């Protein structure tokens, strides 16, 4: 784990492939620095939860990695390739290896769910209309939406259905890497828990690497393999939940050991104890 007292980068095990590698990243809006020499690794096959206080730049980092926000300086490698050194054609190929679920879904309101899912397919320019229809229906089924949702417009969907439709679009080209920006935001507790379960199932079934920006403690506890925390423009700690709970940084202590964090941690420990007793 990394923290302020020990600023070195967490060393990956020999068998862990680094899918996203960020080094000494600086991002600024005007004279305001948002990222100040940020370092981060995301490993193949893991679910990484990325947390931080409001306005700290969690979504900005995700959008910078995606190339939607310009960086001032620093290195961003995706699948072992320096993003800055890719040609336009190489960049398009790399971009097809990931999918994105933006905050609030970001579906095109004038398109049906089917058409939204097909958008990434159309951009490739070599998938037939018939195959796009078949694939769109498969993606709908994959995220747990009924076939009847295909021809609905976003305004006709519930919040949970919008999230699932947006996830289906993110999975349209069978990506290796999925970016999720606050996927459970706006969902009720039951809907959020169901969406967490869906993400975990898809990650396991499809072998996805997941980069998830979130503030949802339930998601962090239930589906994340590792957590990285952002404060003061840097990753102040990165590691599994046990290490995050032991970190002495003031923000992390307030986040994980506050009233809600302590209550959730206690409930999960109680559940684990009951499960262990049930196996005896």
Regions found by a protein language model. Give the residues of each.
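Conserved ABC ATPase "signature" region
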Residues: 82, 130-148
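A short, proline-enriched helix->beta-strand linker immediately N-terminal to the Walker B motif
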Residues: 172-176
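Catalytic Walker B motif of ABC-type/P-loop ATPase nucleotide-binding domains
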Residues: 178-181
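Helix-to-loop junction immediately C-terminal to a conserved catalytic motif
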Residues: 66
């Amino acid at each position: 784990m990394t923290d302020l007292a020990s600023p070195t980068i967490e060393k990956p095990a020999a068998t862990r492939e680094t899918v996203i590698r960020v080094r000494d990243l600086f991002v600024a809006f005007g004279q305001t620095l948002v990222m100040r020499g940020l370092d981060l690794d995301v490993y193949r096959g893991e679910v990484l939860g990325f947390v931080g206080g409001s306005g700290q730049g969690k979504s900005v980092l995700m959008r910078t990695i995606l190339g939607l926000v310009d960086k001032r300086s620093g290195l961003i490698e995706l699948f072992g390739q320096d993003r800055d050194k890719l040609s336009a054609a190489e960049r398009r190929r790399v971009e097809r290896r990931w999918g994105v679920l933006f905050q609030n879904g970001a579906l095109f309101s004038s398109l049906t769910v089917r058409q939204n899912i097909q958008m990434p397919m159309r951009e490739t320019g070599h998938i037939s209309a018939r195959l796009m229809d078949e694939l769109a229906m498969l993606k709908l089924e994959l995220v747990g939406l009924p076939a009847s949702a295909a021809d609905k417009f976003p305004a006709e969907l519930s919040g949970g259905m919008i999230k699932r439709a947006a996830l289906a679009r993110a999975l349209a080209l069978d990506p290796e890497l999925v970016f999720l920006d606050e996927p459970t935001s706006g969902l009720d507790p039951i809907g959020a828990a169901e969406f967490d379960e869906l993400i975990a199932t898809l990650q396991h079934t499809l072998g996805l690497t997941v980069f998830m920006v979130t503030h949802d403690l339930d998601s962090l506890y239930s589906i994340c393999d590792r957590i990285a925390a952002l404060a003061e423009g840097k990753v102040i700690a990165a590691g599994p939940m046990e290490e995050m709970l032991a970190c002495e940084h003031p923000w992390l202590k307030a986040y994980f050991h506050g009233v809600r964090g302590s209550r959730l941690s206690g409930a999960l420990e109680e559940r684990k104890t009951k499960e262990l007793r049930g196996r005896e």
